[in-house]
């Protein structure tokens, strides 16, 4: 709630949230969807004075060995299709949490690709913004190229999002998008999580630009 009060976002995406104790509202934001099959999960909140959710998906992705042995997470993606009440335009926002660092980058790339494909089931060609913990602190140029091959852009925040241990410091939390103009992504001061939160300032591309992007997805 302190994070919301300080920055007043229109949408809030959470990872590793205590799903059994999530409130129905955080300030002016309502809960659109959360995972239910694991204690630490994902959630998406939205400003219901501006937006209306029309469809939701909670998706399990290809499992890592960590998932198979310790079983910490079932669903690693929560996607919501929203309608902007003033313009009537639809778009998709998702909260994503990739497999931990014990998994290979190839598995995380597979999860990212699968997640973006799953989101298209909410509305083919719609503007899409997927944010969260990608657990991909190195070789991001390669990841960016792979994402771009599928019609999306990868955007990092202005500072590292994990700083607790020197060896693991880096950008873990960022965004992939299509049909959005990402103005800025700012890394915010650390709260209770070991990851620093990020704040994304983004606007929908024009309908003509979105149509061009949709052809590439």
Model-derived features: positions:
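Alpha-helical elements of Rossmann-like donor-binding domains used by nucleotide-donor carbohydrate transfer enzymes
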Residues: 2, 79, 110-118, 171
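Structured beta-strand-rich core segments of catalytic domains in phosphoester-bond hydrolases
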Residues: 4, 11-90, 188-189
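Active-site flanking residues adjacent to catalytic metal/cofactor-binding acidic residues
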Residues: 15, 96, 131-133
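Metal-dependent phosphoester-hydrolase catalytic domains
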Residues: 21, 56, 81, 119-129, ...
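Metal-dependent phosphoester/phosphodiester hydrolase catalytic core
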Residues: 87-106
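Alpha-helix termination/capping residues and helix-transition junctions
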Residues: 6-8, 50, 87, 122, ...
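A long, amphipathic alpha-helix that forms part
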Residues: 104-126
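N-terminal, active-site-proximal structural segment of metallo-dependent hydrolase catalytic domains
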Residues: 1-26, 89-91, 113, 128-129, ...
